[in-house]
Amino acid sequence: MSKILVGTSGFGYDDWRGVFYPEKLKKGEMLRYYASRFSTVEINTTFYGIPAPKTFVKMAETTPPWFDFAVKANKELTHNPEVDPGVFASFTEALKPLLEAGKLACVLAQYPWSFRKNEENVGRLRQLRERFGDLPVVVELRNAEWVGEETFDLLKDCRLAFCCVDEPRFKGLMPRVAIVTAPPGYVRFHGRNAKKWWQHEESWERYDYLYTPEELSEWIPRVGEISAAAEKTYLFFNNHYKGQAAQNAVMFADMLGLPTESKETFISEQGQGSLFGMND
């Protein structure tokens, strides 16, 4: 069985104050606090803009030696048929500090639902591997057309890891499958807010969801299958609104019997107790 690491998709959310972070914690102290509770994080801000390398230098220095980062590829690399070589060069240059520090878990390439299964897009996936060389790359395919042995064989051939997901069960969305096509094992929990998935005014509404223990228990055997086939397995919660991702990450780690900080990580608005009712 592989090493299983649980974390969240992003960490710098202001609405986590008073739930996960202390109310008055400064923005610049959030990563250090987060890294005292979790051993991995998924960086999503890189999807929208490419940071200067010094940003990751600071992140690497702020976190413990065992902490690592999954970094989402910039959208220009996944959402445009023609990739600008300059954008790719800037993105890989930004990653160098994490690579040199031994803290880059993988690159997450998230494709849109409109990325359909066809010959052209199969070629784009092959080009993705060629561009990233030997770097570990996880691919999140959001259209259910891709589910099947043909795709899994393609990803294995390209040494691209398949991103398993948990999300609402709508036609055309990815089903809940457990598969490893290349290292690492990888699962993203987006929440099951079916009401707001397609119809929402703000993007965060889609991810306003708190998993129940019963819902997470469905993934225990799946995580077992994934971890049996990969040396490392990453489980990231993307239901970030109001700290629900962090709450579920601790909850699921506890259910899996993984070492975590205590449930006291979660504080009430009064600064006492926890959302898990430790003082009840």
Residue ranges and their predicted role:
Residues M1-D280:
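Residues lining hydrophobic/aromatic ligand-binding pockets adjacent to catalytic sites
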